[in-house]
Design a protein with these regions (language model features):
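Terminal leader/tail segments of proteins
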Residues: 5, 9, 13-142
């Protein structure tokens, strides 16, 4: 098996820093489900998407996609502002394993240094680059 040295070095550095700052719950590379890859592709290419419990809705103004919303079981869990590339993440009222997985897939695509993990039933948002960990608040923008 041939490894890309840069990718391997980056992964090792991030893992080392994560251990030092105590954030080892969600380390790269994040293993994404197929539906999450399809969800991210739909957002990337600004296409509506619906499969199983996940849907993506693109909103256009004058023919240009301005906002993209993501839903899980009909609950709004994320919005991407295509002009500013800011991602707003929400729990949709359900802090479930699936919600966390979908949000982590979105963060992996649009805010790669960020991740959500859970400790003692409480969700946290971590930034692996700065080392900061803050309690997750539904509606926060990254």
């Amino acid at each position: 098996m041939i490894f890309n040295c840069v990718d391997l070095l980056t992964t090792l550095v991030i893992r080392f820093l994560s251990v030092i700052i105590g954030v080892s719950k969600q380390l790269p590379p994040y293993v994404m489900r197929k539906i999450e890859m399809e969800m991210n592709a739909a957002i990337r290419y600004r296409r509506n998407f619906s499969k199983a419990n996940t849907s993506v809705r693109c909103f256009k103004t004058n023919g240009v996609t301005t906002d993209v919303d993501v839903f899980l079981h009909g609950n709004h869990i994320a919005s991407l502002d295509t002009a500013t590339h800011k991602l707003t993440i929400k729990d949709g009222g359900w802090q479930s394993v699936t919600t966390k997985s979908r949000l982590n897939a979105l963060l992996d695509e649009f805010a790669p240094s960020m991740g959500i993990f859970q400790k003692d039933w409480v969700w946290y948002l971590s930034d692996r680059l700065s080392g900061s960990v803050v309690p997750f608040i539904s509606g926060m923008t990254v």
